[in-house]
Amino acid sequence: KKEKSSKLPSSFLYQGLSNNNIDAYMGTFGKAVGTFGSFISGSKDLIDLLVQKSKPYIYSTSIPPSIVEATRASLKIIIKNKSLNDRLAENIKFFKDTAKLYNLNINKSMMPIQTITLGSPELAMKIQKLALDKKLFVQAIRYPTVPKNKDLIRINITSKHTKKHIKELLVFL
C-alpha cells in the first residue's frame, strides 16, 4: 500500500527507504495510537511460523477485545485524517527549530518523543514539578532508566499542540 505521508519521520519515504524488499513490518500501538500491544505483518508463512514458535506470543495473554476495538478506531482516525500526520511533522520541526534558538540540549530525533539532557536527577525532578505547576507536562527520566549523569526530561509533541503551546513550553524551559 502506498505511503499516505512522507512528512512523518517514521515513514519510509521520509528516510529515503523503499519497502520493496522488507520481509516484515513491526510496530506498537502505544504512543501515537494511544492503546497498547504490538504487531508484526508479513507473509502467511512468516506469520504461521511466529504463531507456532514465538514464545512471547504463545505464552502471553490475548489483548482484550475492548483494546482491539479502541486500536481499530484510533487507526481509522489516523488513516482518515492525513492532516494530523502533517501537523505532527510540522510541530516536531517547529519544536526543534525553536529549541535551537533557546540553546536547549535536545536530541537529534525527529520523532514525537523529544528529550532534553540535563545530567542531574534533582534538576530533572525540579523541572518536572515546576512545569506541572504551570500546567505543562514533561517527564523526568532518571537513572537507572538512563545512564548516570544523563538524566533528562521527556516531552511528547502531538498534532493537537499549537505553536503557542510549544513556544510556551520552550520559554519555560
Summary of predicted features, one role per range:
Residues 141-142:
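Cytosolic Rossmann-like ligand/nucleotide-binding regulatory domains
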Residues 22-26, 33-85:
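Conserved core segment of the aminotransferase class I/II
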Residues 133-134, 145-173:
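PLP-dependent enzyme catalytic core of the Aspartate aminotransferase-like
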Residues 16-20, 30-33, 147:
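Solvent-exposed alpha-helices and their adjacent loops that cap or buttress functional pockets
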Residues 1-24:
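Active-site pre-lysine segment of PLP-dependent enzymes
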Residues 65, 69-137:
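Conserved PLP-dependent catalytic core of the aminotransferase class-I/II
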Residues 41, 115-117, 156-158:
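Short hydrophobic/aromatic beta-strand micro-patches
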